[in-house]
């Protein structure tokens, strides 16, 4: 309602919303409206509300904005103003020139006569002349500088301590426009001066002591509501370990029925007296001297359900369960390791051979593993190796592995002693035939190997082309799907 009224150009609507009258400067001072003008606005709002309620035809347009609205919506917005409680408050406006308060008279720099009334005592104060506000005035400082009637207010306050000035009346009038009018815009400029003059009687932003003001439906007593919250339980909930929430039986722990003095000192738990749920923190054991244990004999349904769902605690606890810290957990979640792999094997498994563009990835750890098995030390004891080997005099150690050289077999034929020329000639021909046969077989084997290598290379090239064609086909399908084609 106030957002809708704030867009008006009439005097009454802008006084209700406490908005500046000139749109060229939105930071101007709000108008200080007194009780007579508020009564006029009240009568106007009541007459308008009654006319809307008793009208049988459809209400076509919003009188403020010219926007079509229903009757129910207009009535709801008018009911938000709480007109009944505002109108029923006793008022005794004194006849003063402030009843015909002109807008041009206020903004042209002319002084305006304003009258006020104490809302609690029902006594009228004297009318005084209010100086018009100018853009150079600092109206938010709350001081009496620039206000010629400040000394007069101080004299009236000294004579009548309970009596408030018209600015206090203005604050009180604006606080009754609705229950949600706690904005700083509605605070009086002389609020700090009134607080200093009244002394012990504390006045809040609504113009009356907090103990005399009734809380509205839009407000909440924070101090009263915060007492119902178990802040200690929330701290344990936010600071507990993640493992506690995985195991509910460790989080909700029932206190034993019989508690001795020694057990109460050892198994002291922080719990809430209202909820009957004790919160157990596995990381930090609470000291028994500062946190006494509470009796958990609660009849609430939540605590009974927890007692049924959680396992029963032992009658007496002699020793506390060992607390597992984070630095004690040095194993993986999958379980302990059976063997520790070598660092080179771990990192070499990720080394992969690549061809030119897009080829098959072949792990390079298989050949290395076979060679590493040969280089590993055997299961034979050290003293047996020293006894059987010819190099037993060398300083053998567990980290020393002798290098293994490949032994080549000596090729050739052992020439027999010559017998005669015919026998030597036949042996020479046999050796020549054997060499030719071996060369022939070696050439055939080499040819087969080269042919196999050519076939393998051709197959690898064909696989690369196949993958490239598949990628091109998939990209073409995506383009066709973007254009809206249906592809099976």
UniProtKB/Swiss-Prot annotation:
Keyword Mitochondrion annotated: yes
Main location: mitochondrion
Stretch list, region Leucine-zipper: 462-469
Cellular component terms per the entry's GO annotation: cytoplasm; cytosol; mitochondrial matrix; nucleoplasm; nucleus
Compartment list: Mitochondrion matrix; Cytoplasm; Nucleus
Residue stretches making up the bZIP domain: 420-483
Keywords attached to this entry: Cytoplasm, DNA-binding, Immunity, Innate immunity, Isopeptide bond, Mitochondrion, Nucleus, Transcription, Transcription regulation, Transit peptide, Unfolded protein response
Pfam family name, one: bZIP_2
Residue stretches in coiled coil: none
Knockout consequences: Prevents the up-regulation of several innate immune genes following P.aeruginosa-mediated infection. RNAi-mediated knockdown causes a reduction in survival following P.aeruginosa-mediated infection. Prevents the up-regulation of mitochondrial protective genes and increases the transcription of oxidative phosphorylation machinery and tricarboxylic acid cycle genes following mitochondrial stress caused by RNAi-mediated knockdown of protease spg-7.
Transit peptide (first-last residue): 1-23
Keyword Ribonucleoprotein listed: no
Protein known as: Stress activated transcription factor atfs-1
Designated gene of the protein: atfs-1
Function, in words: Acts as a transcription factor during mitochondrial stress by activating the mitochondrial unfolded protein response (mtUPR). Induces nuclear and mitochondrial gene transcription, including genes coding for mitochondrial chaperones and proteins involved in glycolysis, amino acid catabolism and innate immunity. Following mitochondrial stress, restores mitochondrial respiratory capacity by limiting the transcription of oxidative phosphorylation (OXPHOS) machinery genes and by promoting the assembly of OXPHOS complexes via the up-regulation of chaperone and assembly factor genes.
Free-text tissue specificity from the UniProt record: Ubiquitously expressed.
CDD domains found in the cross-reference section: bZIP_ATF4, RAMP_I_III
Family label: Belongs to the bZIP family.
């Amino acid at each position: 309602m106030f957002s809708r009224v704030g867009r008006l150009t009439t005097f009454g609507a802008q006084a209700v919303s406490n908005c500046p009258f000139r749109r060229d400067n939105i930071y101007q001072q709000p108008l200080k409206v007194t009780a007579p003008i508020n009564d006029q606005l009240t009568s106007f709002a009541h007459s308008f509300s009654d006319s809307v309620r008793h009208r049988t035809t459809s209400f076509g347009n919003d009188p403020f904005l010219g926007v079509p609205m229903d009757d129910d919506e207009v009535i709801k917005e008018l009911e938000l103003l709480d007109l009944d409680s505002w109108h029923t408050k006793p008022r005794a406006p004194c006849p003063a020139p402030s009843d015909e308060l002109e807008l041009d008279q206020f903004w042209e720099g002319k002084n305006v006569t304003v009258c006020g009334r104490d809302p609690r005592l029902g006594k009228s104060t004297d009318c005084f002349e209010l100086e018009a506000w100018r853009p150079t005035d600092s109206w938010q400082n709350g001081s009496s500088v620039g206000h010629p009637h400040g000394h007069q207010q101080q004299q009236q306050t000294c004579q009548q301590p309970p009596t408030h000035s018209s600015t206090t009346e203005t604050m009180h009038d604006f606080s009754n426009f609705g229950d949600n009018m706690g904005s700083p815009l509605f605070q009086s400029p002389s609020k700090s001066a009134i607080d200093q003059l009244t002394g012990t009687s504390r006045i809040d932003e609504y113009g009356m002591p907090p103990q005399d003001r009734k809380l509205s439906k839009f407000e909440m007593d924070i101090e009263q509501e915060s007492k119902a919250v178990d802040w200690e339980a929330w701290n344990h909930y936010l600071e507990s370990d993640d493992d506690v929430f995985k195991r509910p039986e460790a989080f909700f722990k029932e206190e034993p029925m019989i508690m001795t003095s020694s057990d109460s000192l050892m198994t002291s738990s922080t719990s809430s007296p209202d909820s009957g749920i004790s919160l157990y923190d596995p990381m930090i054991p609470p000291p028994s001297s500062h946190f006494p244990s509470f009796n958990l004999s609660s009849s609430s349904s939540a605590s009974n359900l927890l007692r049924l769902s959680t396992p029963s605690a032992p009658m007496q606890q002699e020793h506390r369960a060992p607390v597992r810290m984070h630095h004690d957990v040095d194993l993986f979640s999958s379980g302990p390791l059976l063997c520790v792999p070598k660092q080179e094997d771990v990192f070499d498994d990720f080394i992969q051979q690549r061809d030119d563009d897009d080829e098959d990835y072949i792990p390079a750890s298989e050949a290395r593993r076979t060679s590493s098995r040969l280089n590993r030390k055997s299961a034979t004891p050290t003293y047996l190796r020293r006894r059987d080997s010819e190099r037993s005099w060398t300083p053998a150690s567990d980290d020393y592995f002798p290098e293994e050289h490949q032994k080549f077999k000596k090729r050739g034929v052992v020439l027999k002693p010559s017998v005669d020329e015919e026998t030597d000639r036949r042996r020479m021909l046999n050796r020549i035939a054997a060499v030719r046969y071996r060369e022939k077989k070696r050439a055939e084997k080499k040819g087969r190997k080269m042919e196999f290598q050519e076939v393998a290379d051709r197959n690898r090239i064909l696989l690369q082309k196949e993958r490239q064609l598949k990628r091109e086909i998939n990209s073409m399908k995506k383009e066709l799907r973007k254009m809206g084609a249906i592809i099976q």
